[in-house]
Amino acid sequence: MPTRLQGVLALRKAMKKFEPDLAKETTKEMAAFLKPVTRQARGYIPSNAEIMSGWLKRPNAQGRWANRYYDAAQVKSGISYKTSPSKPNRRGFRALASIFNKSAAGAIYETAGRKSGLTGNFSPRLGGQLKGDKQKMTGRAIFRAFEEDQGKATAGVIKAIESAAAKFNARTKK
């Protein structure tokens, strides 16, 4: 999944400053490759009837537990993408584009059981296999959709950035 590209942040800042139309076009191209993966990941989210019984909304819940429940519609709408660069991690790497789940229940469904695998009481009943290469790069919906995409999204985002760089260099050399 991770791919190393250098100079992309400087390119995007320069495009935003000198060629804003090219920056918008690049963002649209990147989004076109991320949207199918996002749509496919939403399809892997189980309905309210398929999820474990303790996760559904309780009518008599009060306090902090009043807002902590699983709702399939909320989880599906929480899966989205962004094309803006992330903050650097402790090793200095950034994500130029990412697909993530905003909802807490969706994030738990995605990542539960990464360490324990199928040995815990909680994660085997969630259903869905953990897909991905490494322990930190596994999940049930987003990572499964990304794995089935077979790198088309990554290649498309890189191609969009490279074509934007070529267009930007051609426009600024005049």
Predicted segment positions?
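Short helix/strand-capping connector loops at secondary-structure junctions
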Residues: 130-149
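C-terminal or internal capping secondary-structure element at the end of a domain, subdomain, or sheet
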Residues: 144-174
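Disorder-to-helix initiation segments
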Residues: 1-20, 135
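Short, low-complexity, charged/polar segments at coil/turn and helix-coil boundaries
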Residues: 13-132, 163, 169-174
